[in-house]
Amino acid sequence: MDLETGTGKVLPVYIEEEMQKSYIDYAMSVIVQRALPDVRDGLKPVHRRILYAMQEAGMASNKPYKKSARIVGEVLGKYHPHGDISVYDAIVRLAQNFSTRYLMVDGHGNFGSVDGDSAAAMRYTEVRMAKVAEVMLEDIEKETVDFVPNYDESLKEPSVLPAKVPALLINGSAGIAVGMATNIPPHNLSEVVDGLIMLIDNSDIEIPELMTAIKGPDFPTGATILGTEGIRSAYTTGRGIVKIRAQAEIEPMQKGKHRIVVTEIPYQVNKARLIESIAQLVKDGVIEGITDLRDESDRRGMRIVVELRNDVVPDVILNQLYKHTKLQDSFGIIMLALVDGHPRVLNLKEILVHYLNHQKEVITRRTRYELGKAKDRAHILEGLKIALDNLDAVINTIRSSANADIAKTALVEKFTLSLRQAQAILDMRLQRLTGLERKKIDDEYIDVMETIDWLESVLADEQKVLNIIKEDLLEMKKKFGDARRTILSHDTSSMDMEDLIAEEDIVITISHQGYIKRQTLDNFRNQKRGGVGKTGGSGKKNDDCAEHLFLSTTHHNILFFTNKGRVYRQKGYEIPEAGRTAKGTAIINLLPIEQGEKITAVIPVKEFKTEQYMFMATDKGTVKKTNLEDFNSARKVGLIAITLDENEQLIGVELTDGNSEIILATRNGIAIRFDEQDVRPMGRTAHGVRG
């Protein structure tokens, strides 16, 4: 063997080239033959082979169930040379009402659960085709699609199904190929049909108009989609992310208690793991106030019950569950499908257009097939009519012939018939020689000729093809259409900490030495005129005192003004809570104030209204009025509230309505009073005017 010339049975190759070629072959095999659906029928090869094998095995929806192992064997042996587990898993998903929006397989037995339980072994479960699967294969015998050789070229299998329903959208698809993935959500059949009809009526329709019919995904598990931005992005670009939130209600119980009842969870969320995660959050102290957690789901539907203490706000607990568990989840949409054997990311209109083009080809091929059959029948009927018109001569010709072949040849020569017509005459029963039977032949011939005219007109007019598609779609909508399960909410409900905190009245205290704390108003109670009050001390030592004390709520904004003219912003709930006698937290640990910077004013603000103002005064007698709305952008790192001269300090700030009377007083007992309107509003960084 000469390795240099390549003679013999071994050829030298570069391993880099061979690895590149082999990997590309493998990648394309996964992309085209396993992981991605065809845009026309919405099926991956394994699903297409399962449905076709079930039809070939006579497993129609009105026939008895057959063992799942039987169809797995049919698929493996004839069409799909892969593992039996992968085929059975695909069958199981087609039969799970929590995985597939419109079931393709009617399963009998244990096919798993939303808790993540596996289906029973294939030797125990039984299956047959669902009605939707039957219409996917309807007219396949009429040469509507191309057939290709199977893996060993011993049989033929369809390269695509006729797909009378748009399966890619109504059931969606998910798959991971090499270097790409698809994740198409299921949709409501009635809405998709309405969108297709809109496209048939107006081929120039834009995606926003289509979205008036196809409003968004419709998951088999229901739940609620938050916002439309992710849907709009997916429909226009082929990619988007939608947030799905569980359907939950708060129900009252005895003794002022409440419970949260979850009846629908996001798509593809494991219910058992969801409940485990809630229990773990309670155990870890992340969520407090839950006294009982149980799963009351049964054949009537899902029901997860979360019982709460009577001293918690149910909405807050529910928001915490949304925040920390899969009760709120995201679904990343990637509308990737095979178009002419090549993977493409498609928008909503492109998917609908490709489906309609496929249906036009199916209808056209079916019409050609039916036209050929009709012409064949007309040809036979013409021969029978000739025979009946010359009945005596035909009978004599047949009687005088020695055998059937001679009789056939004689009929062809004497009456100018084709061999098929002559054979039909010989096959005709004597009862058809009666007058009534002759009329039936004449009537059938008229009907067949009308059918031929109609079929030819369909082939000549694309609008008639579209009308047929429209009629078929409306029939599918009437037969399989149902109400939307997933609720679409225009409220994006982007959750922040405030959603998770109950709004309650609080008392905020800042001491002279710069310690701050928050207490609930429940720590204080009304006392009569002679009451001695309660200790609200700042620790064990009595060397500190309260300098600022005011009422607010956990949701209010607290603006901290310093002597250096800066302002800092915190939410009420962000201030650390402490007991009545506790010292509190050093304010330098809460706010990024500089050395020598002190809090001189604290203003609680519910809303930043344009008709309210911050009125400021400095130790040099400068005053300034600034619109409250200018402080709405206040960041935790602080903003300039007033520009100060050297050695000047901000000493006071008050919230006004713009029409107040202002009094400035000095330590020497001199005061001035003036109308606030005498001071014009200035920007945040302005210095102010002489007071």
Model-inferred region functions:
Residues 1-243, 303-305, 529-538, 543, ...:
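Catalytic phosphate-handling regions of large nucleic-acid enzymes and associated NTPases
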Residues 6-11, 182-691:
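C-terminal interaction appendages of subunits in large macromolecular complexes
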